[in-house]
């Protein structure tokens, strides 16, 4: 059978199910595909298919993730679901599955549980911008007042982590009953998808963001000048554009791009995803190096101190065998280069064990172009021992 061509007629949005173990995340994922399949907008995926998530490697970390896709009238969705709690932590921190919004699944019979809280915190820390709530297992709760109580608890919890708890859509349903084809509960899945359609905005596409390219290599062409090469991470670049070289120096350096080429051919415009060489006017070979970024002027600034949410690899994942303490000095790998940094643990945290997920403050010995949400690896002697996401810039 010929492969269907991927038609991009609708805006694309990345979402995922989050929440406590056994509250019904995977059942809900299956129910969404089943209900939308009846409208011809998805392929129904059985619970077992989703639950048997394949292992993937992201930054040297093994993560099990299931990917399903489906459509609504307005959009095309890519949806991630993880079998285990640790997979969520790793997924969100490494950015393996960048979510534009999440469906928080809470069992109405149990109310918010520890991982409910942890997933909300993680969403806040790694920059998941919007959350829609699905109160699951409502068929098991006869008491309307109890449902309202659980809803209030969830809203309060969201507000506690700076999500707009009062405005977040909360849909009461039963994923299992919907999956079994009960029309009353299928309706709730449609209601949920309408809420996701309306409440989670279409994300800005990478190509529409301000230009940035991490520099991978630099060389000089006699008589023409200095060329920086790399893969455009976001935005577009045209000949004649002003750019800044940011990072590894206290002040960004301004220059103009006098040529853009790709596969040795000259290009009018490079865009997100292209591997290019950019010819830089008036820049000598020693003024630009791997680890810096080329960026639209003023769009990103160099920093040395920040807070980050970090997942520390277990020894089975090839990480450390022993804990580390404040003042630990590993290498922080941002995009294309390592920079040494000093870690300060939060008050009351004595040490960090392999397998932990922790917030920490980092001070780099050289400034790097970073912003909230920038991902990095922590390395020690060339091996990855942690993965992190910048949650707050300090200086």
Curated annotation (Swiss-Prot):
Domain tr-type G: 10-204
Span list, region G1: 19-26
InterPro entries membership: EF-Tu_GTP-bd (IPR041709), EF-Tu_GTPase (IPR050055), EFTu-like_2 (IPR004161), EFTU_2 (IPR033720), G_TR_CS (IPR031157), P-loop_NTPase (IPR027417), Small_GTP-bd (IPR005225), T_Tr_GTP-bd_dom (IPR000795)
CC terms in the record's Gene Ontology section: cytosol
Ranges for region G4: 136-139
Positions with a binding annotation for Mg(2+): 26
Binding site for GTP: 19-26, 81-85, 136-139
Assembly information from the UniProt record: Monomer.
The protein's name: Elongation factor Tu
Native source organism of the sequence: Geobacillus sp. (strain WCH70)
């Amino acid at each position: 059978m010929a492969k269907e061509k991927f038609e991009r007629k609708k805006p694309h949005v990345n979402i995922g199910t989050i929440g406590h173990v056994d509250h019904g995340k995977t059942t809900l994922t299956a129910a969404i595909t089943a209900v939308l399949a009846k409208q011809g907008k998805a392929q129904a995926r059985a619970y077992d298919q989703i639950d048997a998530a394949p292992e993937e490697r992201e930054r040297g970390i093994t993560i099990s993730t299931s990917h399903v896709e489906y459509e609504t009238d307005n959009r095309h969705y890519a949806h991630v679901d993880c079998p285990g709690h640790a997979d969520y932590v790793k997924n969100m921190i490494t950015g393996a599955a960048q979510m534009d919004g999440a469906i928080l699944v809470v069992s109405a019979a149990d109310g918010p549980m520890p991982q409910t809280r942890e997933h909300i915190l993680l969403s806040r820390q790694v920059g998941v911008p919007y959350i829609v709530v699905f109160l699951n297992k409502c068929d098991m709760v006869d008491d309307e007042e109890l449902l309202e109580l659980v809803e209030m608890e969830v809203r309060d919890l969201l507000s506690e982590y700076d999500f707009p708890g009062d405005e977040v859509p909360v849909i009461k349903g039963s994923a299992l009953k919907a999956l079994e084809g009960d029309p009353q509960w299928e309706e709730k899945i449609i209601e949920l998808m309408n809420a996701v359609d309306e409440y989670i905005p279409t994300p800005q596409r990478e190509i529409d963001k301000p230009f940035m390219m991490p520099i991978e290599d630099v060389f000089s062409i006699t008589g023409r000048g200095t060329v920086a090469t790399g893969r455009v991470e976001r935005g577009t670049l045209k000949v004649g554009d002003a750019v800044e070289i940011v990072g590894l120096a206290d002040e960004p350096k301004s220059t103009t791009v006098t040529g853009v080429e790709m596969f040795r051919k000259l290009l009018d415009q490079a865009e997100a995803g292209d591997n290019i060489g950019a010819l830089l006017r008036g820049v000598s070979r020693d003024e630009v190096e791997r680890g810096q970024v080329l960026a639209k002027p003023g769009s990103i600034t160099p920093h040395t101190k920040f807070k980050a949410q970090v997942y520390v690899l277990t020894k089975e994942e090839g990480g450390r065998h022993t804990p580390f303490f404040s003042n630990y000095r590993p290498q922080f790998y941002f995009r294309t280069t390592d920079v040494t940094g000093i870690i300060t643990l939060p008050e009351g945290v004595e040490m960090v064990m392999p397998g932990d997920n922790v917030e920490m403050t980092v001070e780099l010995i050289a400034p790097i172009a970073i912003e909230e949400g920038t991902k990095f690896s922590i390395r020690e002697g060339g091996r990855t021992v942690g993965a992190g996401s910048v949650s707050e810039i300090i200086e």
